[in-house]
């Protein structure tokens, strides 16, 4: 009996019943989970398995462990003898093995003591909701990860730009050396002079230090509403604003609901208020924005009828992504990025996108529009035929940074699928992009220019198989700057496709949308196109007439005292952003610039430096105003108001994203009145918080004077930078010549790259794009001609306002001066007569 029982024990095989199966990732492993299984904590599972083993099996396991240790001891001794080791060393190995066996026995005894606590929950146990632990949850994901950046490929055509920080560092070092030299010379002169006491210069320096102390803006939130742009609701507000403009030039703003008491008194003879021309224009534009019945009829005929779900359906049915019946790899990708619940635009757009319908979507900035079109695209691509790789989706973006960001978000969401991506962006290597296109990626994310370049010049790129077209920031893509390129793409790709358009300021013009080739699109407008986020505070700093030249002083003051961290400053022109970058560097403020004159490597490095917190300020043009999603942007400053209210909405939308709070400050002068009034009117209609920030003009003048003193140094830096650029270009030309000599035949054998426009048409398109961003005045070149009397008087008046009031001669001074001249002439004649007589 004992022999049979022993044989049965040896033949016994451990099995786990259904009840004993450990709960891993919500259930049994599927084929899709094979790559996740190894990452599970094995120690806890083995511990639970040991607690479920029968006592008879434990005895057999102890016997096996002892025999195993004895065999191990014999093997070690044999190995030691074969290698010619000494006997002592072999015995020592045996003792180690025995000690190990004793230790293992003690561990097993401890495990037997723990068997009584089967029902207790392990203190180290953590619930894994959705398998986020095993798939690597990314917190605060914003599409600018370093891992994805490494996979994007080398920038084969990257140009090494001039390092402005190096120039500023050299100049700072020279200045420090000169100051040290002066101090040493001054110390020597003080040693030579046996003068004791306090010098006048020292006292003067102390006074200057006291004057230069910055005020403390403790009450910066207790702000008064401004008459500038604040009177956007009625005629009484307009009158109050007109009366406020006639007041003193003090920077404090009167109340927008009425004028000062002195101006409002009936006894004073006050002229009838006259509206500002910009206010009249803005009123006309607001009237024109009212819906035209003909346009409404066109819209109703063009768009598909909207389905209005009930509130209960909106709240209950689509509260989570699981309710959209998405595939498991997509849900795992959403969990990895940290998306838990869909936003309003995602709740509306995902079901329509899954049905394959054309749609036009609009929502406020930071509401998740990118995921709203990527999620249905990925879900549809999971059911594609896989025998022949084919490019099926094209996503077009207006800027390179936005395309790179969308590429990173899409690849992260598709981590657990076999969907392939490619980004066609300027600044990256053409050859590497062509090699990727040869593999026929499923999704192509591109800017229009590079997309057309490959479409015309790359033999490996075909657009005949495209099934889905997405235009992100569609209102910008439909403007004149991109009109020609977009028409070229739309005329080439197949007409039978799904088209999706998204933007925060989506246009309602049917004439523009017809160009895209939409087929009864579904219109999904979650928010009004003129609205901002509710968590955004909009602030305005007014510059009085004649103080426009002090604008940089106001900006430096705000960046030094109020907005000191995670700030994006927007400029209209590249040269202004670059000049501000130099001024910030000279004042010791760390900043990065972002505009179109920089190389692609410099642009990405600037965004990364700001994102990682290496620099607190990002000085950018409208290149960064659309779509750029950087976590933690606290404030946005408009150096001057943009050309239109739509551009203003995109600029201020870089902060207060995804439910966070933020502030937007605009430094506004008289030319900016129209945009400011439109922003205030839309904000008040929405119920947003709008305030006017009061800035001490004396302190702003001090900073402006500091900037004026640096003008000569700024010009020297610009000159040095220009010389370094010329040297770099000369080196590049030399390398180009060397390559032509070495590989001339190969280079000449390459087919010439073609474009659908001539150089003249390119220049015209560029002018149209500039006029869209900065207005028609930015394109018109002023001809050199003689100024008329009115123009001279206008220039003189502007100069007098900037310089301030100066003394002028009156009638008495002119008359007295004339008398003195006549007296002087008579005296001179008498002196001449006397001299002649004396000579005779």
From Swiss-Prot:
SUPFAM superfamilies: P-loop containing nucleoside triphosphate hydrolases
GO MF terms held by the record: ATP binding; ATP hydrolysis activity; RNA binding; RNA helicase activity
Reactions mediated catalytically: ATP + H2O = ADP + phosphate + H(+)
Keywords (A to Z) from UniProt: ATP-binding, Helicase, Hydrolase, Nucleotide-binding, Nucleus, Ribosome biogenesis, RNA-binding
Chain ranges of the Helicase C-terminal domain: 554-733
Residue interval(s) of motif Q motif: 319-347
Keyword Transcription found: no
Keyword hit for Hydrolase: yes
Family designation: Belongs to the DEAD box helicase family. DDX27/DRS1 subfamily.
Subunit structure, interactors included: Associates with pre-ribosomal particles.
Free-text note regarding domains: The Q motif is unique to and characteristic of the DEAD box family of RNA helicases and controls ATP binding and hydrolysis.
Name this protein carries in UniProt: ATP-dependent RNA helicase DRS1
Organism, as annotated: Coccidioides immitis (strain RS) (Valley fever fungus)
Gene name as annotated: DRS1
């Amino acid at each position: 009996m004992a022999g049979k029982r022993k044989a049965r024990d040896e033949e016994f095989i451990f099995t786990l019943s259904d009840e004993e199966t450990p709960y891993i990732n919500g259930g049994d492993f599927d084929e899709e989970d094979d790559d996740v299984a190894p990452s599970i904590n094995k120690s806890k599972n083995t511990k639970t398995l040991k607690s479920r083993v029968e006592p008879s099996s434990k005895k057999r396991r102890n016997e096996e462990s002892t025999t195993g240790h004895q065999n191990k001891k014999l093997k070690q001794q044999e190995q030691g003898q074969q290698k010619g080791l000494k006997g002592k060393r072999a015995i020592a190995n045996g003792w180690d093995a025995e000690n190990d066996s004793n230790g293992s026995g003690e561990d097993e005894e401890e495990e037997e003591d723990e068997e009584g606590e089967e029902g207790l929950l392990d203190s180290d146990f953590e619930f894994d909701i959705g398998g986020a632990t095993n798939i690597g949850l990314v917190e605060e994901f914003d599409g600018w990860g370093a891992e994805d950046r490494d996979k994007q490929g080398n920038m084969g055509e990257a140009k090494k730009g001039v390092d402005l920080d190096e120039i500023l560092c050299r100049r700072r070092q020279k200045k420090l050396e000169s100051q040290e030299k002066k101090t040493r010379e001054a110390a020597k002169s003080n040693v030579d002079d046996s003068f004791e006491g306090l010098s006048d210069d020292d006292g003067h320096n102390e006074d200057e230090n006291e004057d230069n102390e910055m005020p403390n803006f403790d009450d910066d939130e207790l702000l008064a509403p401004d008459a500038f742009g604040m009177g956007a609701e009625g005629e009484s507000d307009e009158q109050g604003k007109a009366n406020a403009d006639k007041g003193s030039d003090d920077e404090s703003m009167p109340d927008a609901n009425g004028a000062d008491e002195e101006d409002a008194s009936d006894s004073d003879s006050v002229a009838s208020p006259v509206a500002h021309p910009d206010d009249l224009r803005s009123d006309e534009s607001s009237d024109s924005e009212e819906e035209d019945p003909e346009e409404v009829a066109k819209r109703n005929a063009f768009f598909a009828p909207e389905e209005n779900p009930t509130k209960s359906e909106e709240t209950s049915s689509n509260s989570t992504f699981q309710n959209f019946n998405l595939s498991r790899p997509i849900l795992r990708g959403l969990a990895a990025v940290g998306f838990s619940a869909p936003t309003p635009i995602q709740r509306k757009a995902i079901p329509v996108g899954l049905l394959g319908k054309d749609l036009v979507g609009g929502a406020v900035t930071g509401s998740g529009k990118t995921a709203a079109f990527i999620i249905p695209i990925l879900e549809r691509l999971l059911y594609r035929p896989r025998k022949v790789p084919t490019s099926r989706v094209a996503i077009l973006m207006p800027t390179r940074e936005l395309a790179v960001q969308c590429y990173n978000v899409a690849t992260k969401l598709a981590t657990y699928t076999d969907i392939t991506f490619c980004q066609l962006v300027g600044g990256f290597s053409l050859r590497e992009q062509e090699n990727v296109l040869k593999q026929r990626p499923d999704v192509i994310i591109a800017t229009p220019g590079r997309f057309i370049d490959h479409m015309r010049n790359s033999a490996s790129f075909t657009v005949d198989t495209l099934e889905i077209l997405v235009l992100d920031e569609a209102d910008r893509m439909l403007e004149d700057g991109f009109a020609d390129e977009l028409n070229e793409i739309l005329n080439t790709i197949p007409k039978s496709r799904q088209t999706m358009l998204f933007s925060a300021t989506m246009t309602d013009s049917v004439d523009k949308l017809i160009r895209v080739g939409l087929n009864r699109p579904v219109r999904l407008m979650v928010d009004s196109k003129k609205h901002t986020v509710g968590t955004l505070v909009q602030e305005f700093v007014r510059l009085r007439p004649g103080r426009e030249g002090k604008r940089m002083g106001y900006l430096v003051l705000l960046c030094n005292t109020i907005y000191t961290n995670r700030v994006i400053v927007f400029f209209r022109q590249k040269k202004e952003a670059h000049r501000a970058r130099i001024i910030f560097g000279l004042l010791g403020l760390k900043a990065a610039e972002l505009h179109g004159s920089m190389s692609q490597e410099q642009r990405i490095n600037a965004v990364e430096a700001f994102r990682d917190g290496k620099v607190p300020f990002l000085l950018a043009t409208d290149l960064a105003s659309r779509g750029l999603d950087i976590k933690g942007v606290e404030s946005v400053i408009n150096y001057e108001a943009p050309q239109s209210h739509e551009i203003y909405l995109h600029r201020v939308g870089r902060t207060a994203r995804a439910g966070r709070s933020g502030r937007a400050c605009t430094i506004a002068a008289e030319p900016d009145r129209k945009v400011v009034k439109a922003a205030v009117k839309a904000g008040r209609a929405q119920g947003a918080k709008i305030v006017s920030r009061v800035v001490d003009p004396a302190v702003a003048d001090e900073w402006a004077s500091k900037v004026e003193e640096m003008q000569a140094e700024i010009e020297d830096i610009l000159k040095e930078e220009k010389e370094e650029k010329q040297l770099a270009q000369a080196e590049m030309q030399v390398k180009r010549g060397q390559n032509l000599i070495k590989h001339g035949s190969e280079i000449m054998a390459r087919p010439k790259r073609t474009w659908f426009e001539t150089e003249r048409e390119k220049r015209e398109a560029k002018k149209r794009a500039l006029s869209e961003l900065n207005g028609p005045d930015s394109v018109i070149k002023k001809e050199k001609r003689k100024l008329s009397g009115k123009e001279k008087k206008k220039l003189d008046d502007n100069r007098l306002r900037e310089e301030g009031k100066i003394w002028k001669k009156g009638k008495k001074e002119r008359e007295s001066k004339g008398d003195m001249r006549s007296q002087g002439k008579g005296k001179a004649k008498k002196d001449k007569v006397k001299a002649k007589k004396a000579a005779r």
